[in-house]
Amino acid sequence: MVEHKLDASTISKMIPQIFDQMRRQTGSKNFASTPASISTQSLLKEQEQLDKIIPVIQNLNERIKDCKEGDMERIKETCHAMNTILDKFISIQSQASYVNSMMNNEEYLDYVASGKSEEEYISAKQREVEELEKRVKQYTTMHAPSVKPPASKIPVGNDTRKVTKPGQRNGRSGLYSISTRNNSNNSGANGRRPPGNGNNVGRRRVYR
């Protein structure tokens, strides 16, 4: 069999998960079912409190054994009264923590100092929110990047730039334009040949 060695850090991580899983299985809704809802430190504090309660319960059991039937009824009433007092104390403590958090809330203190009713205070806050939204929209509109229209390539007005016609070549490219080709065609039609290059210059045809 393979032995699994667990160090202290691994055990500290597993204990909260085990307790959290047990509480979910029992269907308790007093605790959130998240891994962060319980920690090892809180479990140690609970263990300390349990260690203090256990001797009290043991002492109570020893005393109950020597009690009579009439004393048992008094003990039950005393325990019931103590439970009621503890429940009230827990409720007061939770309310005290809630009041403490509210007293540290600046917005709540502003509401109390204003002397307004709840509806008036909420409507005033809504107006402040609407005013802030308007300012944000105005700021966004003012600082939005402007989109320029694309530049047109068609000459407008007194544009003196030369526009090349269809079928016409640029003179710098060394090609003939339409007028040059027309002149060469007319000369060929009249029986004349354009002057040649090399040995063909100045020759005449001789008939025998």
UniProtKB/Swiss-Prot annotation:
Extent of Low complexity compositional bias: 181-201
Give any single GO term for biological process: cell division
Keyword hit for NAD: no
State the residue spans of region: Disordered: 140-208
Give UniProt keywords alphabetically: Cell cycle, Cell division, Centromere, Chromosome, Chromosome partition, Coiled coil, Cytoplasm, Cytoskeleton, Kinetochore, Microtubule, Mitosis, Nucleus
What is one term from the GO cellular component aspect held by the record? spindle pole
Protein location: Nucleus; Cytoplasm, Cytoskeleton, Spindle pole; Chromosome, Centromere, Kinetochore
Coiled-coil features, chain-numbered ranges: 115-144
The organism's superkingdom is given as: Eukaryota
The family assignment reads: Belongs to the DASH complex DUO1 family.
Q: How does it assemble?
A: Component of the DASH complex consisting of ASK1, DAD1, DAD2, DAD3, DAD4, DAM1, DUO1, HSK3, SPC19 and SPC34, with a stoichiometry of one copy of each subunit per complex. Multiple DASH complexes oligomerize to form a ring that encircles spindle microtubules and organizes the rod-like NDC80 complexes of the outer kinetochore. DASH complex oligomerization strengthens microtubule attachments. On cytoplasmic microtubules, DASH complexes appear to form patches instead of rings. Within the complex, DAM1 and DUO1 may form the microtubule connections.
Q: What does this protein do?
A: Component of the DASH complex that connects microtubules with kinetochores and couples microtubule depolymerisation to chromosome movement; it is involved in retrieving kinetochores to the spindle poles before their re-orientation on the spindle in early mitosis and allows microtubule depolymerization to pull chromosomes apart and resist detachment during anaphase.
Q: Under which name does UniProt file this protein?
A: DASH complex subunit DUO1
Gene for this chain: DUO1
